[in-house]
Amino acid sequence: MDIQAALGQRAGVGRYARELLWHLGAEAGSDEIAAFYFDFKRRGMGAPPPGVQMRACRWLPGRVTQNLWKRLGFPPYDWLAGDADLYHFPNFVRPPLSKGKKSIVTIHDVSFLRMPETTEAKNLAWLSAEIHNTARKADAILTDSYFSAREIRELLNVPEDKVFPVWLGLPKWGPPPDPEAAMAARKSLGLENPYLLMVGTIEPRKNIPFLVEIYEKFTDFDGNLVIAGGLGWKTGPTLRAIAESPRKDGIKLLKHLGDAQLAALYAGAAAFVYPTRYEGFGFPPLEAMSRGVPVISAKNSSLPEVLGDAAEWVEGFDAEEWARKIRKVLGDSDRMTRLRAAGLERAKQFTWEKTARETWEIYRRFKS
């Protein structure tokens, strides 16, 4: 299993690679799992999970190898990582392999094909070309939802029996934060009023300028709008929308949060609002549910599948309608209680143990 993404990413593909690797050991039985990564700078990955052997390439930088793969299709990945019955690449793309080597690739979503305007231009051309090559050469494709499986079959022209949807898991949270400590953490972030929360990388699919517009329409809410997430790509429209908003003083953009701060944010949120345009899975609202926060979400892409009946849904992108729906939810304590309870139950269905078990079953089908 290639775990390069786990070196530098706390969220997204990095989290997927780390969590899956950590839980696969329990499924392996007599089989051996090896995790491979480039470690030219000697950063290391720490102690391996039980049942996993770590393999690192320390004589060749990963970036150099990536350029060789892009330009020459050489050297084969297995020359560097060692022999295996099956190779799993969890980050969209299959690098070159020697003839006859079997591979599985996780393509988390195909938003860059469905909505190319939301993707960085420097990555779009290469990724769009490489993903077709990957889909053709991989023995099987994993993806995060049934929605994404349909998208992959349609946009990459892949046979139905080659694509396998496997839901992702949620981390096992510790106990809820101490109320006084959580309140102190929120105060340190300048939050003493009620607030609406959105968590996610700042990028076009998250539709944050529209979220700002919703907040502007929700004039009878005198609390804050909190957007927690690192800067991604094409952030200009989002940053301008915040800077030019007549309610800009109430908008908090929090870019670098530790786990304790994020837990405190969830604990104090009046509601989680998610007007995203496209999701291959939708971690943030599911995480909010697991923390007992009522979720108000766009009804599109994978979200109805993942969130089920536990969210308050809004169809389309009319800011007045969104403000009306949020107002209705916040003003109905019974509804808020139902959403909290339903969200907590829904979140229980998503565990990394289940993800690893289903992934291992697919490995078994293709490794021999």
Regions picked out by a protein language model, each given a short descriptive name:
Residues 1-368:
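Carbohydrate transferase catalytic cores enriched for Leloir-type hexosyltransferases
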